[in-house]
Curated annotation (Swiss-Prot):
Keywords: Mitochondrion, Transit peptide. This is Altered inheritance of mitochondria protein 9, mitochondrial. It comes from Scheffersomyces stipitis (strain ATCC 58785 / CBS 6054 / NBRC 10063 / NRRL Y-11545) (Yeast). The gene is AIM9. The lineage of its organism: Eukaryota, Fungi, Dikarya, Ascomycota, Saccharomycotina. The keyword NADP does not apply. It comes from the Eukaryota. SUPFAM superfamilies: Protein kinase-like (PK-like). The keyword Glycoprotein does not apply.
Length: 631
């Protein structure tokens, strides 16, 4: 049987590129329907001249279908081919068809239908299919996977399309950026978290139909098959740099409020441990003994979820060279009375990772060229974070309002963002729960779309002397700072109106104390350790005051890290050089990644050129040339 492969021009916006470029999953829409004769594949390759390619559906080795599996959202200035190869998302097309058939058979199982033959949709334990996949039978509704009019008809794949053109289900496949262990844990936890949010809290999230946490399934890859939500991204309404007006205020709040509402609902549950959510059978026997939260009255939910190891990003990202055994030493779960263990655990795994990389580099066994001096400085920094981590906070401090509530285990979703919210039928659906974890609210960060770490400007004319006399370029710099301050403030006001008992997280002193930990969670390049060290250095000047006010977990005014003048001078020099390097290097903020349409345009213009070693560079002089005036 022949299938048509269509390469169609992508219609995504730049904001979509941002979402996909840094996600650890690729998404493909799967259309299901009554037995059909063809499967359509569509790539997301940006092309002004779409072309049709034919391939045999049973020929998994056909090179013509490669384009569909390849990463096409963007390109990198360095190691482009290698980074794209890590993001290929191959799966068995036949396997998808077989899985859908299995789902249909499972739905028709007498144990899963009522007397009229309709799906029961009752809450049942996760069921494993014969191919190794898992299915949530309570989500096998006709609405989600389609309905066969003839009871003997087969429910088969109708189409396989890109993220932009499908209709019914979304197939999520992880990029090969993390270890098999990390990917497995991440999938199991994300599915359980979605299940919890849907069944326990009744929130608007996609329903998971089936999943596989490893390659032992019909698709031959880890995957999540879930509900497709039709609608528009909330991001379309977000205009963060709009000038102040009643209309702007209403517009900004129309984006912030639904996200704040969602956070408020997930904060309603106090958990019994720190870690991440899993289904009961996916954690150790020891962890199965502890219920995740108290007071569950629904017998169908009492033993549905448990708390296991954390899948927070830092326990998986760039940890490929650490064995599963070593990772398990650091990723929890942790008891509720040991909240600062989360900080020391992050410091410890980063320290272990840096030592491991240094050892491989010195033995000439590293898989890439390493900067040995940078790795040595990383080790020093994470030793400092390890030393200060358990002393950053006093979890019983009387100087922090409602301190006990702030340190209770709460569910934290790191990707609460209008890019991950779909508006559909007057409802807001939240779609991304990767790396969700249970941690103290005081150790969480604000959503990226409102977070601002720069100097605060609350009133341009009062806070900035001579603002009205400045030229337009200088004014714009301060206006940017003002708008970012305003947006973060709006988020804090929404938090205060819903959870006044948690508003102490807005304290500047709390932000300074947790900054070393949050900086460690935001590592994107090897030199970002400089920001971690900088946050620790900043604490030194305030340490006496924090000890005196019992804010930190130390009774000694002696700073836990002993710095020499030589070290501080070297750190300041390294930090300034790195900041200059970042500012002067195009696309440094994205790690050299460029959206594909922009990449191709700049390449055509001669601004991006390929070098002899296969990398690319930006011709700064070419970029600064003025465009010729049109005649």
């Amino acid at each position: 049987m022949l299938s048509r492969v269509v390469r169609q021009r992508s219609r995504s916006a730049i904001s979509s590129f941002k979402l996909r470029a840094h996600a650890a999953f690729a998404e493909t829409r799967i259309g299901v329907g009554i037995s059909v004769q063809a499967t359509r594949l569509q790539s997301t390759k940006l092309s002004a001249n779409p072309e049709e390619i034919y391939t045999k559906i049973s020929d998994s080795a056909d090179p013509k279908r490669n384009q569909f599996f390849q990463y096409t959202w963007g390109s990198w200035l360095e190691n482009d081919k290698l980074k794209k190869s890590h993001r290929e998302t191959r799966f068995s097309i036949e396997g998808v068809s077989n899985l859908v058939q299995e789902l249909n058979l499972t739905r028709k199982d007498p144990a899963n239908v009522d007397s009229s033959g309709e799906p029961l949709l009752q809450i049942k334990p996760v069921q494993q299919l014969k191919d190794g996949s898992f299915v949530l039978t309570n989500n096998l509704s006709n609405k989600l996977i389609g309905e066969a009019q003839d009871k003997d008809a087969k429910l088969l794949v109708k189409s396989i399309a890109s993220i932009h053109e499908g209709k019914d289900l979304v197939l999520r496949i992880p990029y090969k950026l993390e270890s098999d262990y990390s990917i497995s844990q991440k999938i199991k936890s994300e599915v359980a978290t979605l299940d919890f949010l849907s069944l326990k809290l009744g929130l608007n999230v996609p329903k998971v139909v089936a999943y596989g946490d490893n390659r032992s399934n019909a698709l031959q890859t880890p995957f999540i098959l879930m509900e497709y939500i039709e609608g528009d991204l909330l991001m379309k309404k977000w205009n963060p740099l709009a000038a102040d007006s009643e209309e702007t205020d209403a517009s900004l709040k129309s984006v912030i409020q639904p996200i704040s509402d969602f956070q408020d609902k997930i904060l309603s549950v106090n958990f019994n441990k720190f870690g991440s959510l899993y289904f009961h059978d996916d954690v150790s026997v020891l962890d199965q003994a502890d219920v995740p939260y108290d007071g569950e009255e629904n017998p169908l939910l009492v033993n549905r979820w448990r708390i296991g190891p954390s899948i927070e990003r830092q326990f998986a990202k760039n940890k490929n060279h650490l064995s599963e055994k070593i990772v398990k030493e650091f990723n929890g779960p942790w008891k509720a009375d040991a909240p600062l263990s989360l900080i020391t655990s992050v410091a410890s795994i980063e320290l272990e990772n840096a030592k491991n990389r240094l050892g491989l580099a010195q033995a000439d066994s590293a898989s890439k060229v390493e900067d040995v001096e940078v790795l040595k400085k990383q080790i020093e920094t994470f030793e400092h974070l390890q030393a200060i981590g358990s002393k950053l906070f006093n979890s019983k401090s009387k100087s922090i309002m409602n301190v006990e509530e702030l340190f209770r285990p709460k569910l934290f979703v790191p990707d609460l963002d209008p890019l991950n919210v779909i508006e559909s039928n007057d409802k807001s659906y939240f779609i991304d729960f990767e790396y969700s974890t249970i941690k103290p609210f005081i150790l969480t960060s604000y959503p990226n779309f409102v977070a601002y770490h720069g100097a605060k400007v609350y009133n341009l004319e009062e806070d900035i002397p001579g603002f009205t006399e400045m030229d337009e370029v200088e004014k714009q710099q301060y206006e940017f700072m003002y708008y970012k301050t305003r947006n973060e403030r709006l988020w804090e006001l929404e938090l205060n109106s819903r959870r006044h008992d948690l508003i102490a997280v807005a304290s500047p002193h709390v932000k300074v104390l947790k900054s070393p930990y949050l900086q460690a969670l935001e590592l994107k390049t090897d030199k970002d350790y400089l920001y971690v060290e900088g946050a620790i250095v900043q604490l030194q000047a305030m340490w006496d005051a924090y000890v005196a006010n019992e804010l930190c977990g130390s009774s000694s005014s002696e700073f836990p890290v002993q710095y020499t003048e030589e070290f501080l001078d070297r750190h300041q020099t390294d930090l300034e050089e790195y900041q200059i390097e970042t500012v002067s290097s195009p696309f440094a903020a994205t790690g050299g990644w460029i959206p594909q349409d922009m990449f191709e345009t700049l390449k055509e213009q001669g601004i991006i050129v390929e070098t002899e070693n296969g990398n690319y560079k930006v011709e700064a002089e070419k970029a600064l040339e003025e465009e010729p005036e049109e005649k």
